């Protein structure tokens, strides 16, 4: 059970993966799924759903003293990954000194109710755990009762046909204060589910497995058996998380911060773009969740101005040395590039840029020189006629689940000259009034002085990694020459 280096530093599975041999000796039920290999080690066949289910039950029993029923035909949670998720949430709670009366909402708790059970047992949190499937709610109720945690966890059935995810739960508890919400949404759209999974004939209807012949891609490392509702939702996970974002816009700080797991990296871009449209009114972060050979992400955001979204997992930094005084030169260059900076600490700057000004410097200098050149000496280019009309409008501030609220329109017209084409292009992207556009890149820069030189360390706060590398290379070329 290989673990990733990006697991939380407080996760015990990071440095000490489960010992299958010790577990097999202690738990006879788990022993049935183990086998010895030639080097004397004990292995587990992860391609068997029953073996993975038994491993999860055994780890919950040994490490958390939880007796959990995981019925066949439903998703089997991976304990290291779920603990990782809870630890990241705990980091945010600790960073904001929220250590008592912590109440969370687990959206789509499933039959295992694992988020709530681990959160309540390991961290002492209280939970409202919701699910739209009546059978899942019943099994989750039984798991909570079996572990005598009814005082800490309330399992609630919600109407799956209702588009809102959080509104009904919050409105039914007007006097309650919620610290966070968490969610593991269905990853796939229906077409993806039909491509990746087939019906499992040995179980009930609407149960699917990824254990079938693969022609176009390699077989999965472990078997996944799940109900239809656990696998797909209309619009996939992007649409589902957008529904949570919609509710968060209305609820604001009724929930201090919002989180969700993301299963597909391609889903991050549209969701981050959606959050960026709220400008400086929202803070958000993304952190990886590693478990074995599977990678997931946690997306967290908040509308509360006093909240910080810090975790124990730090972004990697890039460093270089430059002649003294590095801090003074750095501030001058950031300002010259049109960026803004502020001192977080005496030797730490936070810099942000709202446009890319550090690339194509030679072309920029040449263009500026042409502007001030004598018009009589300027090169004469072939005549062309270009018309451009730009209108920046204010929308109603409400985003749709898709891009249907925006439009881009382009039309071409023939002219009397057969070699020329006249083109008209229009674009409209509604921007909520009063919203300040978010910078395209934000960096934290630490200056460590030495006797002869200064060391500058750059850490990406938000934006694209390529912008971080471009800025660092530009400043290195400039400050070190």
Swiss-Prot record:
Main EC class the enzyme belongs to: transferase
Domain of life where this protein originates: Eukaryota
E.C. designation(s): 2.1.1.346, 2.1.1.348
Coiled coil: none
Major subcellular location class: nucleus
GO CC annotations on file: nucleus
Localization (cell): Nucleus
Keywords, ordered alphabetically: Cell cycle, Cell division, Meiosis, Methyltransferase, Mitosis, Nucleus, S-adenosyl-L-methionine, Transferase
Residues given in the record as S-adenosyl-L-methionine binding sites: 82, 108, 131, 164, 184
GO-annotated biological processes: cell division; meiotic cell cycle; rRNA base methylation
GO MF, one annotated term: mRNA m(6)A methyltransferase activity
Functional summary from the UniProt entry: RNA N6-methyltransferase that methylates adenosine residues at the N(6) position of a subset of RNAs and is involved in S-adenosyl-L-methionine homeostasis by regulating splicing of S-adenosylmethionine synthase transcripts (sams-3, sams-4 and sams-5). Able to N6-methylate a subset of mRNAs containing the 5'UACAGAAAC-3' nonamer sequence.
PANTHER family: RNA N6-ADENOSINE-METHYLTRANSFERASE METTL16, SAM-DEPENDENT METHYLTRANSFERASE
Record note on quaternary structure: Self-associates. Interacts with dlc-1; the interaction is direct, and is required for nuclear localization of mett-10.
Protein name, as recorded: U6 small nuclear RNA (adenine-(43)-N(6))-methyltransferase
């Amino acid at each position: 059970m290989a673990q990733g280096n990006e697991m939380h530093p407080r996760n015990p599975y990071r440095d000490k993966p489960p010992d299958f041999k010790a577990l097999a000796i202690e738990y006879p039920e788990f022993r049935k799924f183990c086998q010895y290999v030639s080097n004397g080690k004990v292995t587990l066949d992860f391609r068997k759903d029953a073996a993975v289910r038994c491993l999860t039950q055994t780890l919950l029993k040994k490490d958390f003293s939880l007796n959990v029923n995981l019925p066949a035909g439903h998703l089997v949670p991976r304990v290291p990954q779920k603990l990782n998720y809870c630890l990241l949430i705990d980091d945010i709670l600790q960073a904001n000194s929220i250590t008592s009366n912590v109440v969370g909402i687990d959206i789509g708790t499933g039959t295992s109710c694992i988020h709530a059970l681990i959160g309540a047992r390991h961290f002492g949190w209280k939970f409202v755990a919701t699910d739209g499937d009546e059978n899942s709610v019943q099994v989750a109720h039984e798991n909570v009762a079996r572990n005598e945690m009814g005082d800490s966890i309330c399992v609630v059935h919600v109407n799956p046909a209702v588009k809102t995810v959080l509104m009904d739960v919050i409105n039914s508890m007007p006097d309650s204060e919620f610290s966070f919400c968490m969610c593991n949404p269905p990853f796939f759209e229906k077409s993806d589910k039909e491509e990746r999974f087939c019906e499992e004939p040995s179980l009930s209807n609407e149960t699917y497995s990824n254990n079938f012949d693969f022609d176009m891609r390699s077989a999965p490392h472990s078997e996944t058996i799940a109900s239809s509702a656990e696998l797909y939702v209309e619009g996939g996970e992007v649409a589902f998380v957008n529904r949570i974002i919609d509710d968060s816009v209305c609820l604001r700080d009724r929930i201090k911060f919002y989180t969700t797991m993301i299963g597909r990296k391609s889903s991050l871009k549209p969701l981050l773009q959606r959050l960026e449209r709220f400008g400086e009114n929202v803070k958000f972060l993304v952190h990886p969740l590693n478990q074995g050979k599977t990678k997931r992400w946690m997306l967290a955001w908040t509308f509360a101005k006093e909240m910080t979204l810090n975790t124990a997992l730090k972004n990697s930094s890039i460093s270089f040395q430059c002649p003294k005084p590095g801090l003074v030169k750095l501030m001058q260059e950031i300002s010259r590039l049109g960026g803004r900076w502020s001192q977080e600490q005496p030797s730490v700057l936070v810099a942000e840029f709202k446009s890319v000004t550090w690339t194509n410097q030679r072309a920029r200098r040449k263009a500026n020189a042409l502007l001030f050149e004598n018009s009589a000496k300027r090169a004469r280019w072939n005549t062309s006629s270009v018309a451009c009309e730009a209108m920046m409008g204010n929308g109603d501030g409400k985003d749709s689940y898709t891009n249907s609220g925006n439009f881009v329109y382009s039309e071409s017209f023939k002219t009397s000259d057969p070699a020329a084409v006249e083109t008209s292009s229009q674009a409209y992207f509604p921007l909520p009034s009063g919203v300040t556009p978010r910078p395209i890149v934000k960096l934290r820069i630490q200056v460590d002085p030495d006797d002869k030189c200064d060391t500058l360390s750059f850490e990406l706060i938000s934006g694209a990694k390529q912008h971080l590398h471009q800025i660092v290379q530009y400043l290195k070329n400039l400050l070190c020459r």
